[in-house]
Amino acid sequence: MKQLLIFCLLFGSIFHHGDAGCIMRGLCQKHTENAYGPCVTNDTNVEPTAFDKTHPAYEKMVEFCPHLLTGDNKLCCTPSQAEGLTKQIAQARHILGRCPSCFDNFAKLWCEFTCSPNQQDFVSISEMKPIEKKEGFTPEYQPAEAYVNTVEYRLSTDFAEGMFSSCKDVTFGGQPALRVMCTSTPCTLTNWLEFIGTQNLDLNIPIHTKFLLYDPIKTPPSDRSTYMNVNFTGCDKSARVGWPACSTSECNKEEYANLIDLDDGKTSGQTCNVHGIACLNIFVMLAFIGSLAVLLCVGFVFTSYDEDYTNLRQTQSGEESPKRNRIKRTGAWIHNFMENNARDIGMMAGRNPKSHFFIGCAVLIFCLPGMIYHKESTNVVDMWSSPRSRARQEEMVFNANFGRPQRYQQIMLLSHRDFQSSGKLYGPVFHKDIFEELFDILNAIKNISTQDSDGRTITLDDVCYRPMGPGYDCLIMSPTNYFQGNKEHLDMKSNKEETVSEDDDAFDYFSSEATTDEWMNHMAACIDQPMSQKTKSGLSCMGTYGGPSAPNMVFGKNSTNHQAANSIMMTILVTQRTEPEIQKAELWEKEFLKFCKEYREKSPKVIFSFMAERSITDEIENDAKDEIVTVVIALAFLIGYVTFSLGRYFVCENQLWSILVHSRICLGMLSVIINLLSSFCSWGIFSMFGIHPVKNALVVQFFVVTLLGVCRTFMVVKYYAQQRVSMPYMSPDQCPEIVGMVMAGTMPAMFSSSLGCAFSFFIGGFTDLPAIRTFCLYAGLAVLIDVVLHCTIFLALFVWDTQRELNGKPEFFFPYQIKDLLGAYLIGRQRATDTFMTQFFHFQVAPFLMHRMTRIITGIIFIASFITTVILSSKISVGFDQSMAFTEKSYISTHFRYLDKFFDVGPPVFFTVDGELDWHRPDVQNKFCTFPGCSDTSFGNIMNYAVGHTEQTYLSGEMYNWIDNYLEWISRKSPCCKVYVHDPNTFCSTNRNKSALDDKACRTCMDFDYVANSYPKSSIMYHRPSIEVFYRHLRHFLEDTPNSECVFGGRASFKDAISFTSRGRIQASQFMTFHKKLSISNSSDFIKAMDTARMVSRRLERSIDDTAHVFAYSKIFPFYEQYSTIMPILTTQLFITVVGVFGIICVTLGIDVKGAACAVICQVSNYFHIVAFMYIFNIPVNALSATNLVMSSGILIEFSVNVLKGYACSLRQRAKDRAESTVGSIGPIILSGPVVTMAGSTMFLSGAHLQIITVYFFKLFLITIVSSAVHALIILPILLAFGGSRGHGSSETSTNDNDEQHDACVLSPTAESHISNVEEGILNRPSLLDASHILDPLLKAEGGIDKAIDIITIDRSYPSTPSSLPCTSRMPRAHIEPDLRSL
């Protein structure tokens, strides 16, 4: 933690003098307790003197400067100088010691400068100052009258560049070691030398050293002795006998890149190209040409030769048609079986509607009580990730071993001001008043308090995270840490004397004059070196929590440096290891958010942005409540449209109340309630089995199920209305026959479509994505229950309402009744379906669509469109923009925008090793450590490589490797791990026992490792702890806080990084680093980050070659894991859906293979068209869009099955004519019914504030509806016209092709034969209606002849309806039916 201090103390060793070869010698000027200026040896060079071998510093000189101790051991430094030099070189080992060669070169630099007997050859004094007497201190060199203040140190470029080359790739804490020794990024040799030569007494650097570089090639031979040019050691070579060379990861990054190949081929694939053209594009072009050729051939064949029509003519010529094969007979049997049973159900309901009603009520009574167990999941993770998913399983393992990661609370301040024109810190936020406000905010947050359910007060101190232990403050990552949280430090002033030479120094940032901006000088120093213990301003940069504040964590920027920061970030960490801690944290966060919202309204100086861990959940709930009005309006339109569009409205007998006779207001409203009840039943059943939906999924489910139910309601009611046109008058007593006929015509299609819808939904329920799974399961069961309720409760209601209509009674006014029922019927039957939509489809759309050229052109357009959508669909992206879940005005949306724009740090990621390993064994340690002697492809080296290749791995920042720190902490040369001599089992901490750190009271732990001491010193076993010592001191390491004496203490970084078994062994451990900055609005960043992290974890697992499992975990992974597999899962499910739908339609419609194939073609095309439009409108594939694709299956099935059923029931002979009649009769029902209902209610969602609603439930759902309608009403009929099946009743009866009453929605032959047996022989199943059946009751009634003549006359001449007519209609008049015109 104290790298800079440790390194800079090294430079306090640059003091000496001599006469013959020394120009400075001894200590003369005391600046601080650890910084002494060396003595000037006047004008006479002083010869070096022999070093005393008995002095304790001699052994250290042998260790660090052995090249100087040869022969007579004459040096230019005194023993006291050498002692200070070696102590500080030893501390510099913490930073550079990972590469022994680098460290040796660095030691040579300062050994030569301080102690070389040839010092006068390459060191010159530039500035000296008179010695000032200090009490208690006597200069070591008595003749000296001045001390050295500035020197010039001449180096050869060979040594300087060789030293820099050996050190440039050395890492410290996962980052380049030179980064803490150099203010520029990247660090260059010149900048490095200038920085380490800068004078700073507060950092114990007593003199200013100017490095001058000389090129040996360009320097004359006579001058080559004027610069220091000792031999350097390359990083790939051993510096000393017994020392290892630097590891490849610390020496040659280019070579190391060839050793470690992270890509295992599972995260990227090669793109197929032929001469630069994508293979997919080539394929679709060929497919288009082939499809176009097939279409033209088929069009030619079917326009010149109609097999069905020829067979009909042959049959009419007396030729006997071939006997149906077994498949056709089976299909006919299925067809008749379903119609007959449907008719029986309808007739039973017509006779006894109460029984059906009570059966439906029994279903409700069985299902609805389960609602008492109903609850919605409000956990955001549960909404997006399955508990069985890999990320959630790994999260459970991680939490079980290390506890939950801390909760984050964030505040961001942005300045209204512009950049400053001058100054060290010129960013808009570097104003004193802004930092004063920041301190006020922090103090207010610390005073936030709330109470739990027991009345106990909860403050930040009760919930915050303290990495250094109870004796330290909460971890609040903020620039206030640079001032130790003390606002008064902003008023500090500097009055220090000038200590720097007159020459300007680019690295001396601090002014020595008294200034009110001294706080800014101090902050600038902390931004450059955040781990500095003491800046020139006299303050530490360390926070009161015990650690540094990295500039990229506390300052936001959109430039290349933090001096230009335009935002300030404050991050507060809160613990959540246990459920009580989570509850306390959430209570405090609630008050925290309340404070922030209030403060935002009254912060004129800054732009205030914030969020807490619970913010996302809270805002989703709040925004959902705000959108209730929008959803209610949409549902109100849905209910209103269904209620009023089912009926017919015209006045009879000049009575205004008669307008409600043919209305269906109550039936429409109750049908919607039935749909609602079916949803409740689904909820109840699944709740009983413990399957609970995610938040707000039920609203979507109710919406979808209601829309599908509306389709069935319209088909039943409109089918009845159409049949009334072609039926003679039937009395109320014949209601069972009417209902039976309606059920026979609609229930088979209803059953088929419902089964197909439920199947497509249930297939979606097999996914592990909770949002899709729960929606699909609930919707699938609701669809089936809705069918049951339609066949029971709705059917009973339909019977009662039909009886009311047949009796001429208006809704809501039951005492009233139309007297002339027959007169009302004769006009009403004409206006039953002859609306504008019916006429438009019957006379305009259907003939035009079935025209030969129209079909061919439409087919070509369809194929071209399909091919285009395939290409566009291949480019669709996956993901979800988090900001879309909130309104534009939400404080989270604002905060997300600022994070994207200014914040430069990604989320943490933990590489976890799960499994019990023998960590005490050196061979296992070598698989994880990174210093010399460890494997080049060790776990730690791979991690360092991954962190260093950010663009490939999306990893960045420091890598926390506990095994490295522990082995450094317990090593023989480390001052960290010591035990008492009198009690070797008692740990002697550097924090608790400052007076006992000498060898007399405490000695290193390894001195008492008798097992390790039994090995030779050259053996690795000698330098590594034995099993007993390893595990005994591991817990001491985890409790040891880092300090200036020992930077390797593990409490701050590794306290929660290791999980132990009951035997004290390591069960699991984690190695933390960070992702690079990930764009919140670009989910592909998060997806790639997760994929690459897992790629790295797979490589790490191979590196340890053991039974342990390695996985990467981050809090973001459960949210984004779905996107790695959503495309193959969705594709598989849609494929299964298509296959299943084909089978269901084929079987339930009487083995209609051709019709099912046409429906499947439309289904597949519909998928591609929706996905293509998603690409055009920039809507990625995610759980919401996937849900829309599943819904599109249900909607298109509902439409298609009715079209196929109408086509199969048509009595026309040619395929084109059957398709035309289907469009004319089914088209207006579908378009005016479910399509208008869906589209109309969806349009109201466009006014929602939530982008998630406007995009996924307005824009995308509208695309789904329109695409499904186009495929069902245009594409499917055209496909059927090219070659659909003939149905199961078309060959049994030969009729006139032009008889429109025998189109798709007329009675089937079986239905007609059944009704022909009805009492009084009202229907005798003629090909044309017999007028006598209509006129007979009129002729027998009083005045009936006149009325009949009036009606016939009116309908022939098309005049305006006279006032004498019993019924007047508001609807436009249409042509009279053929049977009436024949009168």
UniProtKB/Swiss-Prot annotation:
The chain crosses the membrane at residues 282-302, 353-373, 627-647, 665-685, 697-717, 746-766, 780-800, 856-876, 1126-1146, 1157-1177, 1179-1199, 1226-1246, 1260-1280. Disruption phenotype: Both ncr-1 single mutant and ncr-1 and ncr-2 double mutants exhibit slow embryonic and larval development, and hyperactive egg-laying behavior (egg-laying constitutive (egl-c) phenotype). Ncr-1 and ncr-2 double mutants inappropriately and transiently form dauer larvae under favorable conditions (dauer-constitutive (daf-c) phenotype). The keyword Transmembrane applies. One of its GO terms (biological process) is cholesterol homeostasis. It comes from the Eukaryota. Residues 1-20 form the signal peptide. It catalyses: cholesterol(in) = cholesterol(out). It holds the Pfam family Sterol-sensing. GO terms for cellular component: late endosome; lysosome; plasma membrane. Residues 627-800 form the SSD domain. It is found in: Membrane. Disulfide bonds join C22-C76, C28-C39, C65-C111, C77-C115, C99-C246, C102-C167, C182-C187, C235-C251, C464-C474, C526-C541, C929-C934, C976-C1046, C977-C1005, C988-C1002. One of its GO terms (molecular function) is cholesterol binding. Keywords: Developmental protein, Disulfide bond, Glycoprotein, Lipid transport, Membrane, Signal, Transmembrane, Transmembrane helix, Transport. Glycans are attached at N42, N231, N447, N558, N993, N1082. PANTHER family: NPC INTRACELLULAR CHOLESTEROL TRANSPORTER 1, NPC INTRACELLULAR CHOLESTEROL TRANSPORTER 1 HOMOLOG 1. Belongs to the patched family. This is NPC intracellular cholesterol transporter 1 homolog 1.
